[in-house]
């Protein structure tokens, strides 16, 4: 009897800060003037006048993007991107790497549980879970490459041959012209804007309904910015506009509020989930049966491993799963699952009127729905089918310099300091002072401040 061949194990984990805007997994780290950050969009911070104008004013892009590479013992490399910037790199190596080195990359359930449970005392939601997500996606990319198969074939195969998209952006008429089956538009005003804001919201949605006609599905993204009474009133005032669904009307923590708005408008569809994390967070949303669609983000909730568990729960209640954005990572999931009827495309061009890669210039061959759809043929490459753009790779900043910085001398040393070494073997020379170029400028984001510093150290 032939023995089972030895499968490669995990040899190394590397992480990189992605320098610059418009590249990588942080959707909101884009140039000024982009519709995602600099148009009227109601947000949880819209209750304060100084944070209405731009979403960057309250820090939506503060973390930036990062990339994780996982190398197997045979030299095969899987990778994935997400949001988290320098703090993400720190946790990858200072905490999660211990569970990965020497492990069998096929043990995705085990590795997820170890990372999730080990970070439970400070995690469960938010950044720690988003970091686990990127590690998990890099593992799936590695597995696909080791087996020479696309990820969708590893998680059940194709449930359909064609993947249809709706488009989220500022101009539903443009989405219709580009071939998308429907469009979702962000709501501009919140309850703090009072009666005038309510009236403007209705007028805004009426304008877009008229621009696309009565038969084109129109959805509304409220981005966690409303409350129960406001949602009920707004939905009532828009009944004649035939809104296909109302998305993320309430705070992610107000799960009971969805019961109230569904009771008030049982004939309407309400959705949420992009800011929920792990199967535990989704359990109550699903069991309540107050949501018509759930919308997890595979780059945030725990990766492909956890998304499959959430989808299985939702399938038992016949609740469709329509992931939030996430490019190719979502596409492989959606095309493999029977209860995932379509996918979101988040318009990445500055004006939202053209189709560009979700991850900017990071990848050479990111599939994009140029006519509102993709097919399995577009996804038939090993792993997630992505290749890092050499130009973008040249701008990646290794976290070696973040994790092993050259010390700045604040007090005069009594003895000659020892020369440390980086993992690469290069000497780390003690510095006499913090160079001016490493000091954060006023208003700089966290990623800008740290990347400026590590660039200087890398050049030293």
Feature map (PLM): residue ranges:
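Metal-dependent enolase-superfamily TIM-barrel catalytic cores that perform enediolate-based chemistry
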Residues: 156-261, 265
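Short beta-strand elements
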Residues: 66-72, 367-369
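Shared catalytic-loop signature of beta/alpha-barrel
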Residues: 35, 48-49, 242, 253-375, ...
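Glycine-rich, aromatic-flanked loop segments that form ligand/cofactor-binding clefts
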Residues: 127-130, 136-170
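Metal- or metallocofactor-binding catalytic centers and their adjacent structured scaffolds
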Residues: 54-56, 71-146, 350, 415-418, ...
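Flexible C-terminal active-site loop/helix
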Residues: 5-25, 29-53, 326-443, 447, ...
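Conserved, mostly hydrophobic/aromatic
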Residues: 10, 75, 96, 135, ...
């Amino acid at each position: 009897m032939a023995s089972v061949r030895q499968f490669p194990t995990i040899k190394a984990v590397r992480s990189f800060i992605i320098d610059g805007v418009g590249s990588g997994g942080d959707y909101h780290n884009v140039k000024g003037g982009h519709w995602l950050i600099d148009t009227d969009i109601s947000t949880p911070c819209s209750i304060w006048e100084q944070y209405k104008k731009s979403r960057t004013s309250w820090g939506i892009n503060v973390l930036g993007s990062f990339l994780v590479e996982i190398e197997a013992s045979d030299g095969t490399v899987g990778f994935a991107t997400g949001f988290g910037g320098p703090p993400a790199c720190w946790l990858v190596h200072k905490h999660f790497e211990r569970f990965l080195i020497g492990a069998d990359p096929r043990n995705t359930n085990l590795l997820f549980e170890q990372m999730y449970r080990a970070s439970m005392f400070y995690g469960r939601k938010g950044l720690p879970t988003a970091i686990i997500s990127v590690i998990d996606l890099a593992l799936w990319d590695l597995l696909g490459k080791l087996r020479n198969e696309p990820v969708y074939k590893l998680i059940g195969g194709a449930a359909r041959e064609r993947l249809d998209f709706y488009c989220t952006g500022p101009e539903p008429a443009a989405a219709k012209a580009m071939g998308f089956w429907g469009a979702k538009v962000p709501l501009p005003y919140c309850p703090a804007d009072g009666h005038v804001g309510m009236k403007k919201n209705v007028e805004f949605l009426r304008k877009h309904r008229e621009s696309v006609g009565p038969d084109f599905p129109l959805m509304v993204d409220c981005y966690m910015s409303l409350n129960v009474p406001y949602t009920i009133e707004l939905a009532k005032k828009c009944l004649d506009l035939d809104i296909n669904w109302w998305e993320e009307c309430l705070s992610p923590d107000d799960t009971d509020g969805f019961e109230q708005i569904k009771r008030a408008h049982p004939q309407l569809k309400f959705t949420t989930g992009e800011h929920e994390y792990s199967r535990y967070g989704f359990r109550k949303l699903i069991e309540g049966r107050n949501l018509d669609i759930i919308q997890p983000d595979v780059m945030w909730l725990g990766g492909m491993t956890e998304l499959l568990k959430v989808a299985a729960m939702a399938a038992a209640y016949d609740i469709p799963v329509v992931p939030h954005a996430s490019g190719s990572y979502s596409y492989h999931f959606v095309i493999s699952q029977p209860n995932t009827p379509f996918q979101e495309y988040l318009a990445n061009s500055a004006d939202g009127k053209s189709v560009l890669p979700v991850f900017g210039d990071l990848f050479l061959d990111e599939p994009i729905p140029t006519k509102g759809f993709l097919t399995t043929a577009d996804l038939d490459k090993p792993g997630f089918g992505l290749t890092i753009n050499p130009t973008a790779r040249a701008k990646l900043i290794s976290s070696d310099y973040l994790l092993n910085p050259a010390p700045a001398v604040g007090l005069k040393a009594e003895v000659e300091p020892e020369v440390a070494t980086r993992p690469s073997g290069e000497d780390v020379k003690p510095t006499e002072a913090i160079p001016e170029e490493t000091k954060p400028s006023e208003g700089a984001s966290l990623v800008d401040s740290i990347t400026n510093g590590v660039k200087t150290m890398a050049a030293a």
